[in-house]
Structure formats: structure tokens, C-alpha cells
């Protein structure tokens, strides 16, 4: 599992809930910019990973289980869930 895999899963999960990443963050009680693409890498080029707390909050706010999220990590075609 890579940095990109986790961020792609968040993007796909948000889409599956008919939300933008910003909308998903806001719905979850997070800052709306939490999942912005600009925050996925530091200014020094180091990857920033989403926190387990953030993932926990998006699951709780949507009533999803961890399996509902992790299925998007290895999914080759997100279009089937749009």
C-alpha cells in the first residue's frame, strides 16, 4: 500500500458518497481543506499521510465500515462506483 493508494481511496470513497473530498471532510467534522491535493505533500516534497483519526471520522460520519473504505485501495476501476 502506497501513499498514493490511500489518497486515491479517499478520493474514490468521497465520490462513492456523492461528495467532494472537501465535502467529505466537512461532513466528518474536519477542516474542509484536510483532503486537498495541495496538502498531500509537504513543501519539501515529503508525503503527508492522512491520519487514522481522519479516516475514523469519515467512516463514522458516513456510517461506513473499514472494509467499505479499504476496498478502494486496490480497486483498479473507480468508475464502477460512481
Language model features: what each stretch is:
Residues 43-60:
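Short, basic-rich loop-to-helix N-cap that marks the start of a DNA-contacting helix
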Residues 1-27:
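A short, Lys/Arg-rich alpha-helix, primarily the initiator
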Residues 32, 37, 60, 67-82:
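Short, charged recognition helix plus adjacent turn
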Residues 29-48:
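Recognition helix of helix-turn-helix/homeodomain-like DNA-binding domains
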Amino acid at each position: 500500500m502506497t501513499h498514493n493508494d490511500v489518497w486515491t481511496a479517499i478520493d474514490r470513497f468521497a465520490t462513492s458518497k456523492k461528495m467532494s473530498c472537501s465535502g467529505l471532510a466537512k461532513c466528518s467534522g474536519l477542516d474542509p481543506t484536510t483532503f486537498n491535493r495541495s496538502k498531500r505533500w509537504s513543501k519539501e516534497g515529503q508525503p503527508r499521510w492522512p491520519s487514522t483519526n481522519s479516516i475514523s471520522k469519515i467512516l463514522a460520519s458516513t456510517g461506513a465500515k473499514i472494509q467499505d473504505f479499504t476496498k478502494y485501495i486496490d480497486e483498479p476501476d473507480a468508475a464502477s462506483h460512481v
